[in-house]
Amino acid sequence: MAEKSGWAKRAKQPGRGMGIAAWFCHLGYFAEVADVSVDASGKVTVNHVWAAGDVGSQIINPQAAESMGFGGVIDGMSEMGQEITLAQGRGVVQSNFHNHPILRMKQVPPIEVYWRKTDYAPTGLGEPTLPPILPAVTNAIFAATGKRVRTLPLQKSGFSWA
């Protein structure tokens, strides 16, 4: 991830930062780096995302695997901007994308996905790309602003998607 994202050469600019997060899931290791910009009003733009995972010994369909990586990142970023509302005694209020939308195309950054093949048994690769994007982005926001995001959605911490 360090090489692909240019981590060692990242510039120290006000309002710009990179963050990393990693985790172990489905018998594989996954890491993501996010590069973000934050303006004076707290509007966050994710400029680029790099995602990588150790998914075992074989990938049957590389194009589908890459698409699943994209989907996990986009879905995870979407969850950062809103929360699920529960109505007492009725369950979840949101019923579909009209009242719980995913990111719009203009908000989706360039995403690079890399899979590392190892001698381990094949593992899942779609779902494990979702969780690390949340701390990768919030760590990047901290690098850009000095302010930690400890509560989601972003609006609860004074930020929102640009």
Residue map of PLM features:
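Short beta-strand scaffold segments in enzyme catalytic cores
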Residues: E32-V36
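C-terminal catalytic domains of large/alpha subunits in multi-subunit enzymes
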Residues: M1-L27, S37-A162
